[in-house]
Amino acid sequence: MKYVYLFSEGNKDMRNLLGGKGANLAEMTKLGLPVPQGFTITTEACTRYYEDGKKISEDIENEIFENIKKMEEITGKKFGDKENPLLVSVRSGARASMPGMMDTILNLGLNEEVVEVLAQKSGNPRWAWDCYRRFIQMYSDVVMEVGKKYFETLIDKMKAEKGVTLDVELTAEDLKELAREFKEEYKSKVGEDFPNNPVDQLMGAIKAVFRSWDNPRANVYRRDNDIPYSWGTAVNVQMMAFGNMGETSGTGVAFTRDPATGEKHLMGEFLMNAQGEDVVAGVRTPQPISHLKEVMPKVYEEFTNICATLENHYHDMQDMEFTIENEKLYMLQTRNGKRTAKAALKIACDLVDEGKITDKEAVLMIDPRNLDTLLHPTFDTNALKDAHEIGKGLAASPGAAAGKVVFTAEDAKKAHENGEKVVLVRLETSPEDIEGMKASEGILTVRGGMTSHAAVVARGMGTCCVSGCQEIVMDEENKRFTLGGIEFTEGSEISIDGSTGRIYKGLIPKTDAAITGEFERIMAWADKYRRLAVRTNADTPKDAAKARELGAEGIGLCRTEHMFFEKDRIAAIREMICSDTAEERENALAKIEPMQQKDFEALYEAMEGYGVTIRYLDPPLHEFVPTEEADIKLLADSQGKTVEQIKNIIASLHEFNPMMGHRGCRLAVTFPEIAKMQTRAVIKAAIAVSRRLNTKITPEIMIPLVGEVKELKYVKNIVCETADEIIKNENIDMTYHVGTMIEIPRAALTADEIAKEADFFSFGTNDLTQMTFCFSRDDAVKFLGAYYYKKIYENDPFAKLDQKGVGKLVKMASTLGRETNPNIHLGICGEHGGDPSSVEFCHNVGLDYVSCSPYRVPIARLAAAQAAIKSEK
């Protein structure tokens, strides 16, 4: 197996092997552009490094030095030679651009003897010693993890002693003294002398790149961006080009288009007599790239021609790094540039208009996840730089929120009514908190994962939420908490970012969401190519209307229980729960029925004839009963019972494992009158709206938590008898569908039997994931961190569908269901319906639709189109 490739041996299609940087250096070499030559150590060598117990094997080391010899032949220089040394840079380069990977090491190959000869021969001793002190600092920081700050302190001390403000004002003698001090600092921190042998330096740097693939920052970034650990990183070893040789040398970065707005103009900065990170370090003010035209017109002309060549070649906006050495231009890197979501849409549309790409390619260019930032407010970028970050939780629902801390839903509601902006901070939220959640700018919880109550409800409402911040020390009773060493009480100011999970002290200004015309164009192209329909999970007319505005083609999940928690309804529900007889229950349900009917009518109207799937009552009854003494007394008085009797009823509802207890279809089996009432409300609402709007409505009734076909058959009979009677009495031609959620593994395993009784399956992947993995979505956050660290799991299975296990059940149930009912309609309504990788899986399995939170509808539409286009290839 070949582990090392010269740049002249690769191309852009080898990024899996050579990494993004290596593949693009090879491609630029192939295009005849001025690239300092070198070689790439492959991602497979990185994988082997970990397999061999974090060692570089002898055969790979031999191959590295064979390629060093080839570099010597190409450059006419010799690695480790005093008279004519080959100096190199070492850079990491995974196949996907990854912040958090190892920083670059420049000027590798220098030692005290080499630098003395270099100073003499070049006639530029300042340059030689500047290179050496930079190398010592970079190697110490990057390879040996001695922090930059120690060396920066020594530089600042030297500048103060010499009475200068800039590094470039230090003389050769000053820099020589700095190099000596740096080596002393290195020895004091590491306990050994700085390595003089270039071979040891090179192998140390290569190992450091491989090690950085497994550092905490890289692991977090990989998990957030769905990058597998197995990919590994490549290493690029490249001949040095020096931008610090004087005023005819320099270094810079540039974009072929504006990465913030997408406007078509060259944008970037450069700095003369500089190297490495000087451009972005902020010590000296860089010049705009347009100024290079005045400083070096020929170099500028060559550079702009190269920019045009690269953008035309890659058919995308390029982010490039370059160095000028004595008026000679060298290209060090090109890659598809990172950009804002707004810029991504504009660039894609402009490239189509310029004839450089097709609309299909434009659809594939956009990362669906980035659309979130277009649909929600974000923090002002400049203000964020100065913000005081105090902690981090899970990025549960995107957007930015800033306001005063409140600890109860009631307080949130009151503050909102008084015109105050608040952030609701809770240990965890429950359905009782809905009103307060609606009134809050954002929600912060100590417990719970990506599919906890807080996360799911917040996403549905489009409200910012950070969940599972276990660093918070909460004192709910006294309304205070501590985070990042700071105590927050009621009224303290806080800001949370639901897109990153970051939490800040104080109020940060926000920028409003802005949807542009390019958004509509991209979405229209996506709709042209996708096969999957996209529905929404919505419980209120407001959510349904927002989802329609964002392109939803119906409601895939309406959770009826969320309608019961408003004050005028909860009393009737509690009355029903505490009834002694079926007659009493029916009387209580009769009060709820018109309210439910009104809700359903509003949803049917908002959906304008598109399908609406209504899930019958699902949660265990204990979630509806009062917990406060005053509420218990109120309920007792209204029912003519004693407080003690009500408390006994509440106690009788207690379950050791309520999520696997008396809930879902089991409620309808034990209390059929609940299913009858909900059926009447569904059918009457459909009839009323179909007559009012003169449109055909086909109600879709979904029975939850079915694990045995006889359960479905029993509840379905109740539904059909009730519905048929109403339709007959109303003398209307109306059809309706009865289906079930597949959320219990047994339902997936017996889907062929269940399909005979169902018009549709909707995979409830939140519960299906819980029951397949056997852990709670609210509690898993406690141990998932350890599982990520130990490489047991790479992703949160509640955020990204587990395709090996849960996915296998979905696939099996789809196949079995279609065997006995070829016309069965298949969809997914768990939170995975808005995750791009899960949507792609749904497309490949052959589902008919996905359903997700309203604000994730555009993400699902784009992801579905990308899945369809990819499957054509």
PLM regions with names:
Residues I206, L375-F407, E520-T536, D543-K546:
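Flexible inter-domain linker/hinge segments
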Residues F39, V446-G448, S467-Q470, C558, ...:
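Short beta->alpha connector loops at strand-helix junctions that form conserved
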Residues R91-S92, I515, W525-K873:
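Conserved alpha/beta-domain cores
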Residues N236, V406, V423-V425, L444, ...:
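Structural motif
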Residues K328-Y330, L427-K438, G442-L444, M450-V456, ...:
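Glycine-rich phosphate/ribose-binding loops and adjacent secondary-structure elements
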